[in-house]
């Protein structure tokens, strides 16, 4: 199975505004199936830290173009992120 892992951080205020839900909806809208999601609130640094992994089977965004599609969402929520590809 080929999967993608999105590691991201964003100011904690955006956690209350649905950033995780919006990212999950973005993935599902592009036929991604979320396999794992882990979140951590770092109140000392005022950050939401998150890891989302999804199955790439059927995902309709080529991984090389992910940044182009994800950029508007990243800018809206001030997201810093890293995308990694894995094989299980």
Predicted regions and their residues:
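A conserved regulatory-domain signal marking ACT and ACT-like small-molecule sensing domains
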Residues: 1-88
């Amino acid at each position: 199975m080929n999967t993608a892992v999105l590691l991201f951080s964003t100011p904690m205020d955006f956690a209350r505004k649905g950033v995780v839900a919006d990212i999950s909806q973005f993935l599902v809208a592009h036929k991604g199936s979320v396999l794992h999601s882990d979140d951590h609130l770092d109140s000392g640094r005022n950050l939401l830290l998150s890891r989302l992994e999804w199955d790439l089977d059927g995902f309709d965004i080529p991984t090389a173009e992910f940044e182009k599609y994800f950029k508007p969402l990243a800018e809206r929520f001030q997201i810093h992120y890293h995308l990694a590809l894995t094989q299980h």
